[in-house]
Amino acid sequence: MDLNLYLKQLETLVNIDSGSHNAAGVNKVADVIEGWYRDLGWHVINHDVGPEAGRLMEISNRPADHYDVMFVGHMDTVFPDGTAEKRPFSMDEENVYGPGVGDMKNGDTAMYHVALNADPKVLENLNICMLYNPDEEIGSRYSREKMDEIGRKADIIVVMESAGNKGTRHCFARKGSMGYELEFHGQAAHAGFMFSVENASAILEMGHYIVELMALASREEDTTVNVGLASGGTA
């Protein structure tokens, strides 16, 4: 594997803002990746999953109705527009940095290098697919139906997202996830008269809930809890 080429390609992807809701940015990443594979002579199918997300890419070494092996990655990140400019790709002696460098533009690039470095005999005998998801960070909200349809064509599926940084090599199962949106309503009042008029702080109540929710986390049961976004108040 050509590490210098890998890092150069990774830098290109990391320096493109591609938050899940930035369809244009995700498609810019897709354009770059698609070019890599077309230069190898691979077959590319672009699936439109709606205007709210970038495109889903089904890439294979030949057109096929069945895949022996499928590698899966996602092109979107959790970062807002402008992050790539504020902290672009960088390196030190041990690590690389930048938005999406570990989740999972490293894996997206590695998928290409699987194709680039595959034994020709393997490519001759196996149907291999590289599937690039545009909206994984928001639960594959727009691509899930098509992802499931394509996934059923494969005998083996390997997700190329990083499994961890503490010696983990492969992850065969972990855990599911659930998400909730909670809305709190209070009774508005002037702060200077809070002891003399009826009032109730929705923000204070939300704070109590946050503390209680975080207490549900358990190291022993590997139950993790995260309050990802909280806001409230008007003045």
Regions found by a protein language model. Give the residues of each.
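Acidic/His- and Gly-rich active-site-bordering loop/insert found
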Residues: 1-99, 120-123
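Midchain, well-structured core segments that form catalytic/ion-binding scaffolds
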Residues: 144-235
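Broad gene-expression machinery/nucleic-acid interaction feature
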Residues: 56, 86, 127, 155-157, ...
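Alpha-helical metal-binding/catalytic segments enriched in His/Glu/Asp
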Residues: 71, 91-138, 178-184, 193-215
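A general structural motif
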Residues: 66-68, 125-127, 153-155
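Catalytic metal-binding/acid-base residues of hydrolase active sites
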Residues: 19, 76, 137, 163-164, ...
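Short acidic loop-to-helix transition motifs that present clustered carboxylates
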Residues: 50-54, 137-139, 165-166
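Generic structural signal for residues in well-ordered beta-strands
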Residues: 44-45, 128-130, 227
